[in-house]
């Protein structure tokens, strides 16, 4: 929730979510995030079928022997700032879709609820975000740090 709050605080009007693949991820979460943020959410989700595996994949027969024809059914979609579908999840097929988004709806919905407006009580709480690039590994040699 805090990472999302940081994005909301930056004034995000369009959020792009990338999922490994499956309507089970996109159907509920996309609408929830859109309604919570009062922004548009585009969820992009992968489609994986048996025939999509390269033929030189190690142990391919073993991987696919009990697999269903579709391993990840996609589910790419767009939800509006009110949580309603602009484009419902597209499953079991590849495709490209487009939509025209009315960003005035974002402002209208934020009149109803603004997640980082006065409801967030900035007089009581504060979220600090460290935007400095972080290193995954810090090497230490004789007590000093080397990044």
Q: Residue locations for each model-derived region?
A:
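CN hydrolase (nitrilase-like) catalytic-core segments centered on the catalytic cysteine
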Residues: 1-97
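A short, polar/charged loop-to-alpha-helix boundary motif
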Residues: 93-113
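Serine/threonine-rich low-complexity intrinsically disordered regions
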Residues: 49, 99, 121-123
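A sequence-level detector of short, solvent-exposed, charge-rich linear segments
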Residues: 22, 26, 53, 60, ...
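Cysteine/selenocysteine-centered motifs that mediate thiol-based redox chemistry or coordinate metal-sulfur cofactors
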Residues: 106-147
């Amino acid at each position: 929730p805090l990472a999302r709050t940081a994005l909301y605080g930056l004034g995000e009007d369009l959020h792009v979510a990338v999922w490994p693949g499956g309507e089970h991820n996109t159907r509920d979460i996309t609408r929830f995030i859109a309604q919570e943020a009062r922004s548009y959410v585009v969820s992009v989700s992968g489609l994986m079928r048996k025939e999509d595996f390269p033929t030189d994949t190690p142990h391919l027969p073993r991987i696919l022997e009990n697999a269903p024809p579709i391993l990840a059914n996609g589910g790419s979609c767009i939800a509006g700032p009110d949580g309603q579908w602009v484009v419902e999840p597209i499953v079991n097929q590849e495709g490209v879709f487009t939509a025209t988004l009315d960003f005035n709806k974002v402002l209208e919905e934020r009149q109803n609820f603004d997640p980082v407006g006065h409801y967030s009580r900035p007089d009581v709480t504060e979220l600090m975000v460290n935007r400095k690039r972080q290193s995954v590994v810090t090497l230490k040699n004789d007590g000093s740090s080397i990044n």
